[in-house]
Design a protein with these regions (language model features):
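Beta-propeller blade termini and top-face loops
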Residues: 19-631
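C-terminal motif of bacterial Sec signal peptides marking the signal peptidase cleavage site
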Residues: 14-15
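Sec-dependent signal peptide recognition
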Residues: 1-7
């Protein structure tokens, strides 16, 4: 086996001739008119699986029993439903940027909607703010915002719909911004990276609340002219890990009692740092919950996976009977975090972390109970990783056409959109028990094409397509846009289909975790029979690392019994079709330079003696000759 290393110096390649490149770059309009319109594409689906969604709004304050909804997928753009989420339609999936992170509606004109792009806590750069004046039929870019990388939150002033506030961050134009002309021009009213903003109407004046990343809560009682730090400190430097407690924050104020507000903060590790409450419009704040890494305190699991962290009583046992350190990687409050207040009751507070939690006692210590479960098929199931909660505009009112008091709430997460019609019912104080949760949810994702595929494979006969999704498992296509079946859960990653036998498929979970599937499809009913087992246990991950989060593997295109994968070493199996998955063996072909893992592997389709491997962040590419002959 011969290895040739090719080093690409990105500074030279991309740095040279920048002016010539920029001047010759095709415009969005030219690309749209020349290539996209001349190519016919059909949406294969899945139409029954939703993807990561960080924003949702409900049109207007009507008394209709059926809501018109708008949802922003982080891939896919803005979708609209006119039947309460039973079906969805993409409004404009050819916008220059479809990474929608936040939505806001003009309170005086339902046809005017703002969409902020760029996902600060997901890694996708945006292109500022887009606006529609015809309920989503057409969208235009607000030009003076186009250099904003991450638009984290947009709020239209409740006093004057000409005034808009935007919390923004990133290397481009960043800060807490204000527009007084419906988004035509923008002014920074606070320069720190801003990740959330809330606005309360107090006697005709906008009280503005912003959360500055790592620095904490800022408050203005004069429409943003002057700000005061209320929680945290202006002296903390961005990404200062010596004082890592004020990482991400979320703000919520009560609709029924506007003087009441809450602040949720996670630390740099993604754990709950604290919850604060104000009862005087933000003049004073009291910390009601303090996690502070003390495992004896309650509520330590609010922003974490309750199956993997200390339970509500701090006794060190996780839900599956084992013990685990509180600093577990499943603490991810910097990725999924939200706080909101019941519109009819200022004491009822919802928190979204990996799961949903609710306090009926004004966020007092020990008062948060579990309100959903991310596994199983019970009525309390909601997909993991919560991002947003929106209540019906008529929440808490008696609805003659609805059949009682409106308790509808919509929840967005990594699985799309869910709705509950009884969101005020029972919760449980035990994070490891869910049978007593009374809140029931329904998944509403038909037509909501917002999934994020990491990788996919097509069978040689074109009959099957298998793909790995972000947090939605591995899906198998077998006939139509509605005929997609999940064959593995969690995060889906790389996939392959045996070119000689399309009923044999391979999928992977995060890191090096490869499975072999034997698939049988009933041609009459479309039912799937899926027998699977892991085949990567023979790879040494303790010495050579667990690989990349989304780790590559590849079948040899000229030998369907041979597979390659990589961590800090390159591995080959010559018997991936062994009678038992436990009999699959692996050979170490050698290590890469440094501590980088293989990121991508490809083999020449006509010559298995030529392989290329892209490695880590070092811009190194390995050309490997005769990999089947090594080591």
């Amino acid at each position: 086996m011969k290895i040739i290393i090719i080093l690409l110096v990105f500074g030279l390649i991309f740095g040279c001739a920048k002016e010539e490149y920029d001047s010759a770059a095709p415009t969005y309009e030219s690309l749209y008119n020349s290539s996209v319109t001349k190519t016919n594409w059909t949406h294969m689906g899945p139409l029954n699986v939703g993807g990561r969604t960080r924003s949702l709004l409900i049109q207007g304050d009507s008394a209709s029993s059926i809501h018109t909804l708008y949802a922003g997928g982080v891939t896919g753009g803005v979708f609209k439903s006119t039947d309460g989420g039973e079906s969805w339609k993409a409004l404009n999936d050819l916008m220059p940027n479809i990474n929608v992170n936040t939505l806001a509606q003009d309170p005086k004109n339902n046809n005017v909607i703002y969409a902020g792009t760029g996902e600060r806590y997901g890694g996708f750069r945006g292109a500022g703010i887009f606006k529609t004046e015809d309920a989503g039929a057409n969208w235009t870019s607000l030009d003076n915002s186009s250099d904003i990388w991450f638009v984290n939150k947009i709020v239209v002033s409740p006093n004057n719909s000409d005034v808009i506030y935007a919390a923004t961050s990133g290397i481009g134009s960043a800060g807490l911004k204000k527009s007084v002309d419906k988004g035509i021009t923008w002014t920074n009213i606070h320069s720190d990276y801003s990740v959330d903003v809330a606005v309360v109407n107090k006697d005709g004046t906008d009280y503005v609340y912003g959360y500055s990343e790592w620095k904490g809560l800022i408050v203005s009682f004069d429409g943003g002219a002057n700000f005061t730090h209320k929680v945290g400190s202006s002296s903390i430097l961005l990404y200062d890990y010596t004082t890592p407690n004020y990482s991400r924050g979320s703000i919520a104020f009560s609709k029924s009692t506007p003087s009441r507000g809450y602040l949720l903060v996670s630390n740099a590790a993604g754990q709950l740092y604290g919850i604060w409450k104000t009862s005087d419009y933000g003049a004073n704040w009291t910390k009601t919950i303090s996690q502070d890494n003390d495992t004896t305190k309650t509520d330590s699991w609010l922003l974490s996976d309750s199956t993997d962290v200390f339970d509500h009583n701090g006794n060190g046992k996780n839900c599956f009977g084992g013990t685990i350190d509180l600093n577990d990687l499943r603490s991810q409050g910097n990725y999924d975090q939200y706080i909101t207040v019941d519109p009819a009751d200022a004491d009822v507070v919802w928190v979204g972390g990996i799961e949903l939690f609710r306090s009926d006692s004004a966020a007092a210590s020990g008062s948060f109970n579990k309100a959903s479960v991310w596994y199983g098929s019970e009525g309390s199931y909601v997909h993991a990783d919560q991002h947003y909660i929106a209540f019906s505009p008529t929440y808490g009112r008696d609805m003659p056409g609805y059949g009682g008091t409106d308790k509808r709430a919509y929840f967005t997460n990594d699985g799309g959109v869910f709705v509950s019609t009884n969101s005020k019912t029972g919760t449980t104080a035990n994070p490891c028990e869910y049978s007593s949760i009374g809140v029931e949810y329904k998944e509403i994702v038909k037509g909501y094409g917002t999934t994020q595929y990491y990788h996919g494979a097509v069978s040689k006969d074109g009959k099957y397509v298998v793909g790995g999704l972000q947090d939605q498992g591995v899906t198998l296509y077998h006939g139509s846009s509605d005929n997609w079946t999940t064959i593995a859960g969690g995060d889906g990653a790389y996939n392959a289909i045996d070119p000689d036998n399309s009923s044999i498929m391979y999928s992977s979970y995060i890191y090096i975790s490869i499975r072999r599937h034997n698939i049988t499809v009933d041609n009459e009913t479309g039912a799937i029979s899926n027998s699977s087992g892991g085949i990567s246990s023979g790879i040494d991950t303790s010495t050579y690392g667990k690989g990349s989060f989304i780790n590559p593997f590849i079948l040899d295109p000229n030998n369907s019994s041979r597979m390659y994968t990589a961590n800090k070493a390159l591995w080959r199996s010559d018997n991936v079709k062994a009678a038992s998955t436990s009999d699959v063996t692996w050979t170490n072909l050698g290590t890469f330079d440094g501590s980088n893992s293989g990121f991508e592997i490809t083999i020449a389709p006509s010559n298995s003696k030529v392989m290329y491997v892209g490695v880590g962040y070092s811009a190194s590419f390995y050309r490997i000759l005769n990999p089947a002959d090594g080591p």
